[in-house]
Design a protein with these regions (language model features):
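Short Gly/Thr/Asp-enriched flexible loops that form oxyanion-binding sites at enzyme active sites
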Residues: 93-108, 182
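Glycine-rich, flexible N-terminal cofactor/catalytic loop recognition
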Residues: 1-63
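A contiguous loop/helix-start segment that scaffolds small-molecule binding in enzyme catalytic cores
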Residues: 2-6, 81-82, 161-233
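Short active-site oxyanion
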Residues: 28-34, 110-113, 165-166
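Ordered, amphipathic secondary-structure segments that act as subunit-interaction surfaces
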Residues: 79-97
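Class I SAM-dependent methyltransferase SAM-binding "motif I" and its flanking Rossmann-like core
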Residues: 2-5, 101-158
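Short glycine-rich anion-binding loops that position phosphate/pyrophosphate groups of nucleotides
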Residues: 11-13, 88-92, 172-173
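Conserved helicase motor
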Residues: 61-68, 141-145
């Protein structure tokens, strides 16, 4: 029976080829079909897998917000061909639309094989020193003012009442705005950790209380950087 392999990709730019352990690479060298977010980025990742098939003969299928007829992406599985599922960055299905494909695979009794790799969300949580036994990934922070204030109230309650760590990401060009908003609207004793450009040479983990962030806010420029925002006590 065909299998769906969930293949991790590099967190770095330019792409790093030291992501998947060698013994796992051997499991996927035979693949000829891949589902990716973006064809160009997916092709760069696939080249590093050192497949048995040359890249020109690899079938690359895109899954993104413009994709129609998602069921059709699984057709190779039904004819006995294994498929690899890749995110543009990090782990498939984590802050990534790949979960739709995995859900369909389960519905069709296709074996799903997750491979080991790095997640910026978990790396950031590990490095934050905040509660790793009760945490929530919230995706992107709301943009509209009303929804933002509702979210602030919600996460503040969860942080204080349940000691639940809250994790967010943001579009890189809105990072600075989100940082300022959090500092100006959260309670002084809440801890905010920024995990910046993880696994890159300029990686930073910065942790302060909101009170302290207010004193040093102008010191850090995170515009257009890859940042994980982590909140807790």
């Amino acid at each position: 029976m065909a299998k769906l392999y969930l293949i991790p990709t590099s967190l770095t730019n330019p792409i790093d080829d030291c992501v998947i352990p060698q013994h796992q690479l051997l499991l996927i060298k035979h693949l000829k079909y891949f589902i990716v977010e973006t064809a160009k980025i997916g092709r760069m990742h696939i080249k590093l897998l050192k497949l048995d098939t040359i890249i020109q003969n690899v079938n690359i299928l895109e899954l993104n917000k413009h994709s129609n007829n998602i069921d059709k992406l699984l057709e190779p599985l039904f004819t006995g061909n294994d498929i690899g599922l890749l995110s543009d960055c990090g782990l498939p299905c984590i802050a990534d639309p790949g979960n739709i494909i995995v859900s369909l695979a389960h519905e069709n009794k296709i074996e799903v094989v997750p491979l080991f790799g790095s997640s910026s969300l978990l790396l950031g949580l590990m490095a934050s020193g905040l509660n790793g036994q009760n945490f929530s990934f919230n995706g992107y922070f709301p943009i509209s003012e009303d929804k933002r204030q509702d979210k602030i109230n919600q996460i503040t309650n969860l942080i204080i009442k349940d000691k639940q760590t809250q994790i967010f990401i943001e579009t890189p060009f809105r990072n600075q705005q989100l940082l300022k908003y959090l500092v100006h609207n959260l309670k002084d004793d809440i801890i905010l950790v920024l995990a910046i450009n993880l696994m890159q040479k300029d990686q930073q983990i910065i942790r302060h209380s909101i009170n302290n962030w207010g004193k040093i806010l102008d010191k850090y420029v995170i515009h257009k950087k890859e940042v994980v925002f982590i909140l807790g006590i």
